[in-house]
């Protein structure tokens, strides 16, 4: 009887413990119903998300978030959008390199020498 109590409690614990996590599927359908035909300037972008086809949505989806908060779905087949993605990835990589450089950059402090401590230079004539 003593051995079955911990086993029983273990089984209850395992069945009552909930599994937490982020679902792999977004919301069960495509996020982009219509795509905008207008061109977006790279400087007005805040974020650019690209979603690959999944069981819930057969299309590749590209969602652009502007600095003013508006979101737009872009057509991934347009050459302008492909160029926009390349420029965005280039900007993101450049920002990562800048952060990495600042993170590991060490500055060397050199003490200043006062004029009175400097060795005097003799004039030769």
UniProtKB/Swiss-Prot annotation:
One of its GO terms (biological process) is cellular response to lipopolysaccharide. Gene3D superfamilies: 2.40.50.40. Keywords: Cytokine, Disulfide bond, Inflammatory response, Secreted, Signal. The keyword Secreted applies. The gene is CXCL9. Its main location: secreted. This is C-X-C motif chemokine 9. Cytokine that affects the growth, movement, or activation state of cells that participate in immune and inflammatory response. Chemotactic for activated T-cells. Binds to CXCR3. It is found in: Secreted. Pfam families: IL8 (PF00048). Residues 1-21 form the signal peptide. Belongs to the intercrine alpha (chemokine CxC) family. One of its GO terms (cellular component) is extracellular space. Residues 93-125 have a biased composition (Basic residues). PANTHER family: C-X-C MOTIF CHEMOKINE 9 (PTHR12015:SF210), SMALL INDUCIBLE CYTOKINE A (PTHR12015). InterPro entries: Chemokine_b/g/d, Chemokine_CXC, Chemokine_CXC_CS, Chemokine_IL8-like_dom, CXC_Chemokine_domain, Interleukin_8-like_sf. GO terms for molecular function: chemokine activity; CXCR chemokine receptor binding; CXCR3 chemokine receptor binding. Residues 91-125 are annotated as: Disordered. The keyword Disulfide bond applies. Disulfide bonds join 30-57, 32-73.
